[in-house]
Amino acid sequence: MSVVTACITPFKADLSIDFAALESVVRSQEHAGNGVFLFGSTGESLSLAYEEKFAALSFVSTLKLNVPLFLGVTATSIQEAISWIEFAQRWPIDGFFVPTPLYTKPGLYGQKVWFEKILSVSKKPIILYNNPSRTGVALHPEVVKSLASHPLCMGVKDSGGSTQACTLFAESGVRVFCGDDGMWPEMRLSGASGLVSVLSNVWPELARDYVAQCRSIDAWKKTCSWLELSVNPLGIKALMAAQKMIECELVRPPLSIRDFQERDQLADILACRAILQAELLSVCVQ
């Protein structure tokens, strides 16, 4: 498994979860052989009530996917994180993505205690998540090194925005997943061996093939740069709606689709799909 898709949570016009669209999203990943990651920032986890997460997890579990299923753990307190993990691990899931706690900005020792406590209660593999732009603090490489030998420490997702941390994480001996679609070739050279992708929501097979070939392609870079112009998941939802993959592009407060200002470039981005497909195919033919 080289690609794990950070899946959107599709909504209806009344902002309730669109379960039919959710099935379509995860089935498309299953068809491509990509892992499924629910309840991350792309999935608007913080805008989902506990009962809604329960309903979505219950629903996806009934689909009996034949690809790995991961869940996000977004919490400000250790009690909240542990409560979610203890509940969710009763379902047929394959692991959790766990960032540093939100807002509190713990240091080296605080992070170590945070992850040690989570590893002590989890019965499923844990992927530590470095995302300082979301949490306010970077994951310390020393924390990763100290936890690397734990049997349930599966690896690190690195969304730190540079290759430096990726190199240090990889030197700890854990598997590193690149958390930035646009940085995959550079991160691969720095030790990453997989991609947690947003773009694969809309192009699952192309993302899989792009990661396998591991080379810089302008059409991919252009699309990633366009997605980064707006806060995630505004761009990916707009792109999926334009391709008729979901009926509604709406996001929940405090996000608003009215903040999406890049609609005039959608036609160019949609054209990137054919260009990317042709480039990937040309390598396969050679």
From Swiss-Prot:
It is an enzyme of class 4 (lyase). The record marks S41, Y103 as: Part of a proton relay during catalysis. It catalyses: L-aspartate 4-semialdehyde + pyruvate = (2S,4S)-4-hydroxy-2,3,4,5-tetrahydrodipicolinate + H2O + H(+). Keywords: Amino-acid biosynthesis, Cytoplasm, Diaminopimelate biosynthesis, Lyase, Lysine biosynthesis, Schiff base. The active site is at Y129, K157. InterPro entries: Aldolase_TIM, DapA, DapA-like, Schiff_base-form_aldolases_AS, Schiff_base-form_aldolases_CS. It holds the Pfam family DHDPS. It is found in: Cytoplasm. Its main location: cytoplasm. Pyruvate binds at T42, V196. One of its GO terms (biological process) is lysine biosynthetic process via diaminopimelate. GO terms for cellular component: cytosol. Homotetramer; dimer of dimers. Catalyzes the condensation of (S)-aspartate-beta-semialdehyde [(S)-ASA] and pyruvate to 4-hydroxy-tetrahydrodipicolinate (HTPA). This is 4-hydroxy-tetrahydrodipicolinate synthase. It comes from Chlamydia muridarum (strain MoPn / Nigg). The gene is dapA.
